[in-house]
């Protein structure tokens, strides 16, 4: 597998878990704990896909999503959320988010979703 994935979540454990899963799949992965780190990585490393938590202190998921799209219109985004933030999720989907996973998510489902999205590009 090829492709670059950015994991954006303020929870260290989630970032590490997804990092390990996607690295085993052969993807190059980047991690960000907040929006500022995420946008820096998007500018420097040009990831193909972002796995983005909606509830992050400081810059929230919608702000991060919009800023990522301003930097790279073609970037793909998959959302994660631990809360029933239906308004935020709908807004992100309206802006072009591919899908949403509620935490706790099934790791195999998110792995398959990423595989499917990055395979479309290849």
Curated annotation (Swiss-Prot):
Keyword DNA-binding recorded: no
Source taxon at top rank: Bacteria
EC primary class: transferase
Protein modification: Phosphorylated by KinA and KinB.
E.C. numbers: 2.7.-.-
Example of a GO MF term: metal ion binding
SUPFAM superfamilies documented for this protein: CheY-like
Protein name listed in UniProt: Sporulation initiation phosphotransferase F
Organism per entry: Bacillus thuringiensis subsp. kurstaki
Biological classification of the source: Bacteria, Bacillati, Bacillota, Bacilli, Bacillales
Gene responsible for this protein: spo0F
